[in-house]
């Protein structure tokens, strides 16, 4: 007899999207305590999708572009993606080396399905975006964590010695994310070169997630695609959600050599058939909206500066100014030590008492995040100031509690 609850055995290791847990707590607090909620947990731009993109989607719908496309995506969009990457990074991507997916998460899922066998090891940064590890575990693989180094002065950087020490005969893949979620780090060109060299020299697949590549405030964004022999080791993932404020539209893409993309197409056809047709047409137009993108990034830089300045005034908090993405990752170890809370309990207490949503760093496994909170500055400046003032009051209360 088979039960409907007789799930794949690997599901026992997989957790839900745990950032949503804190949003649910906030909803309950708002309902029961009538407290105003300030949400620093959100991982998406707060601006509406740019008008020209919306108009292109409407036009595609009006023209009846509502049927299945190729599993690889429409040629017009694949060509646009290749042209954009080649112009920006001086690389040589061909249209046939691009597959369009219904979001960057499905892109990551396709990559992991294609490569990960039971007992394969995948090296992830600690901390890192939680979905990487969950999908690896679902497929029977084993996440192995390589620590990032942190100092208040320098922020986060690659710990090459720790990374190399984690490589074994079972290592199948290294996952790299730049700019980085949850820390907001834009890794230096030298750090990117180190990752590329380690992958190439050890003949390990490099999966590079560069979804935040346009959210750069200082420094140079070096893409892994800039390496001349990228086809020998690289699987590149990106998408439209962050750059063009299209999170709900669900569109991403993978770049890899042609033989790999052909295999991806077989998987895609069996998993979801094809990306949404009219959304692809809208995405073609997205490449004409970089004036709007640049305005958004300038706005986010101002917000970052406001949040950083306000956080430096908070007792018990140490924070580095991030150069990329739209996250701040302050160290709250002094507050934890004084209050006796762990970081998850602290985040919940902050919601319950002040209505401020942050994401505890422990959500971004494994160990480094246990002393950090993630805050998004994808909200307006007044909300940032109000929210950080509440955190300041809360921190003083916690620091004086013992």
Curated annotation (Swiss-Prot):
Instruction: Provide the organism lineage as a comma list.
Output: Archaea, Thermoproteota, Thermoprotei, Sulfolobales, Sulfolobaceae
At what positions is N6-methyllysine found? 203, 385
Q: Which reaction does it catalyse?
A: L-aspartate + 2-oxoglutarate = oxaloacetate + L-glutamate
Thermal dependence summary for this entry: Optimum temperature is above 95 degrees Celsius.
> Which gene codes for it?
aspC
Can you provide one Gene Ontology molecular function annotated for this UniProt record? pyridoxal phosphate binding
Which InterPro entries did the record assign?
A: Aminotransferase_I/II_large, AspAT/PAT-like, NHTrfase_class1_PyrdxlP-BS, PyrdxlP-dep_Trfase, PyrdxlP-dep_Trfase_major, PyrdxlP-dep_Trfase_small
The residues that the entry says bind L-aspartate are 43, 181, 374
Q: What is its EC number?
A: 2.6.1.1
Q: Which coenzymes or cofactors are required?
A: pyridoxal 5'-phosphate
A Pfam entry, by short name: Aminotran_1_2
Protein name per UniProt: Aspartate aminotransferase
Gene3D superfamilies (alphabetical): Aspartate Aminotransferase, domain 1, Type I PLP-dependent aspartate aminotransferase-like (Major domain)
């Amino acid at each position: 007899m088979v039960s409907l609850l007789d799930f794949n055995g690997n599901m026992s290791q997989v957790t839900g999207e745990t950032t949503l847990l804190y949003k649910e707590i906030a909803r309950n607090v708002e309902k029961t305590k009538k407290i105003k909620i300030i949400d620093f947990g959100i991982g998406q731009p707060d601006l509406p999708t740019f008008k020209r993109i919306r108009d292109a989607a409407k036009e595609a719908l009006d023209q009846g572009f509502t049927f299945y496309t190729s599993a690889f995506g429409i040629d017009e969009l694949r060509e646009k993606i290749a042209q954009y990457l080649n112009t920006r990074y001086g690389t040589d991507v061909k249209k046939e080396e691009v597959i369009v997916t219904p979001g960057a998460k499905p892109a990551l899922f396709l990559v992991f399905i294609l490569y990960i066998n039971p007992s394969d090891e995948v090296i992830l940064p600690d901390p890192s975006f939680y979905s990487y590890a969950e999908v690896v575990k679902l497929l029977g693989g084993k996440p192995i964590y390589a620590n990032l180094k942190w100092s208040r002065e320098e922020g986060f950087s690659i710990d090459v010695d720790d990374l190399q020490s984690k490589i074994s005969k079972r290592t199948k893949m290294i996952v790299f994310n730049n700019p980085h979620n949850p820390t907001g780090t834009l890794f230096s060109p030298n750090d990117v070169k180190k990752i590329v060299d380690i992958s190439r020299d050890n003949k390990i697949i490099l999966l590079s997630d560069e979804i935040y590549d346009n959210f750069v405030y200082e420094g140079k964004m070096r893409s892994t695609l800039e390496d001349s022999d990228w086809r020998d080791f690289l699987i590149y993932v990106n998408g439209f959600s962050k750059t063009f404020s299209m999170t709900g539209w669900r569109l991403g893409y993978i770049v890899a050599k042609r033989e790999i993309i052909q295999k991806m197409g077989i998987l895609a056809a069996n998993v979801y058939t094809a990306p949404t047709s009219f959304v692809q047409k809208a995405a073609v137009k997205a490449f004409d909206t970089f004036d709007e993108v640049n305005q958004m990034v300038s706005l986010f830089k101002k917000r970052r500066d406001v949040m950083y300045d306000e956080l430096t005034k908070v007792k018990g908090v140490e924070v580095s100014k991030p150069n990329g993405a739209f996250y701040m990752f302050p160290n709250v170890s002094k507050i934890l030590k004084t209050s006796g809370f762990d970081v998850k309990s602290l985040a919940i207490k902050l919601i319950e008492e002040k209505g401020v949503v942050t994401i505890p760093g422990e959500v971004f496994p494994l160990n480094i995040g246990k002393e950090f909170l993630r805050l998004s500055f994808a909200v307006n400046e007044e909300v940032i100031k109000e929210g950080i003032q509440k955190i300041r009051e809360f921190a003083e209360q916690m620091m004086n509690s013992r």
